Amino acid sequence: MNGNMMGWDLTIPQAISHAEKYNYDGKLISRELDGSIKETTYGESIKRSKKLANALSKLGINLHDRVATIAWNNSRHFETYFGVSGMGAVLHTLNPRYSPAQLVYILNHAEDKVLIIDPTFIPLVEGVQEQLNFVETIIIAAEKSSIPDNSLNNSCSYDDLLEQESIEYQWPDLSEDTSSALCYTSGTTGNPKGVLYSHRSTILHAISIAGTMGFESSSAVLPVVPMFHVNAWGVPYSALINGFTLVLPGHALDGESLYELVQKESVDCLLGVPTVWLGLLQYLEGKGLKMESVNQVLVGGSAAPYAMIKAFDEQHDAFLTHGWGMTEMSPLGTINTQTKKAMSLPTEERYQLQTKQGYPMFGVEIKTVDDKNEELPRDGEASGALKVKGPWIMHTYYKADEPAVDDEGWFDTGDVATIHPDGCMQIVDRAKDVIKTGGEWISSIDLENAALTHENILEACVVGVPHPKWDERPLLFLITKDGNEIEKQEINDFLLEKVVKWWLPDDIIFVKELPHGATGKLLKVDLREKYKEHLMEK
């Protein structure tokens, strides 16, 4: 016997309509391209989203058509989120740090008909426009007067386009299974793969993260995680639904600019990758400043080191919350929130707990399996391939012939993890980053975190490279705080207090910078390729 409840599709137009009625005065703060800080409301942004929907309709955009963006976290990009998906088209956010060849591949694979870009990215698009097979119109997200001379074909000003349109627009009735957005994976091996989200998955994820992260209507949230990466972790959608203040940092992600926004808007929650927070902490420490309003810093993309967790707590009274997920998961899967258990622990034990990736949100199931696909015990010791399933987790890559899940519906994340008896999940490493040496495993993440507890180490990266006897051995790359090299023996002696001897790196290489992707993740594949003969030559 079925229940007698109403059927009601979970769609982005429903979220927009809700915000128009109840969250219209919610604040949207945005740093614009000229550096100015703009304040508007969700009500005003929705009016402009309706204008955009009207304009796109006149440009021939219909249900399911793809509209791409290459843009920073700003007010126009926010309007695009809802104008595109709200009309039933597919919002395709593009990572501007893809190589030109990858951009061409992705735009052609997605068959984007319209491309909306910030003026910053005009040179990037000029270099590839002749290779784009489907893009008919390029919209530059600025006033016409501020757009530099360029050679783009069939281009127009975003503001001029909207100026001609009416704010009257009737959002369509969509099935919740209609596609809403498209995001491509990082593509470190082979071509990037497309992940096509639905309205249902997007809304369910947005509702869930608000409760899990503790967002309230009185919150002020600053996502440094880019809007071109997995929908900025779903925060823009959650903001519209819940009405909290959304603070968008634009292109200025330096410590001074972020601190200015935090202070001016009394931001209480920050979201981003560890490399961004490393720069912010350095700036604040150098200036002797404290973030008075921030109480939570959500970290994802890569593991936050113990030293960062400690610094946010001791210097800013802010709790660093680890989250974990991936593009295929919309992205959030687990989160290590401020539970009563965590807050009751002695400080040092709490910091250690905070280094873990946390507990699955409702809607996400996790398990680890061995090489025979047998589920491993949740004992905090056994580690194996991490698999997931849930309503906002991908089943099949965009345009792929075969599902990406196994026969039981589980998706293999490519991570190696351990699950503790209380359900807390800890990433041991990416499967491709685990160092296999003499039949044993070394976690590059654990070795990096051990190095980062040294008082003069700013950033660390560990990769496995071929070894003539042991298959692979670790190389440790370091950036020091003072820019000077440290005696390698000192580093090894320091590490030996934290790891077993056979984990010690075969070489330590001091560098001025490490390669990062657009989302802040270390590009270990670049280092592995560059140094693949390093130990073979010794």
Residue ranges and their predicted role:
Residues 9, 24-26, 139-140, 155-156, ...:
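Conserved pre-ATP/AMP-binding loop-to-beta segment of ANL
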Residues 15-17, 58-59, 86-160, 482-484, ...:
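Structural core segment of the AMP-binding/adenylate-forming
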Residues 28-74, 78-82, 99-104, 157-160:
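Conserved AMP-binding/adenylate-forming core of the ANL superfamily
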Residues 267-272, 282-352, 365, 372, ...:
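Gly/Ser/Thr-rich phosphate-binding loop
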Residues 360-387, 421-422, 484-488, 523:
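Conserved beta-loop-beta connector loops within the AMP-binding
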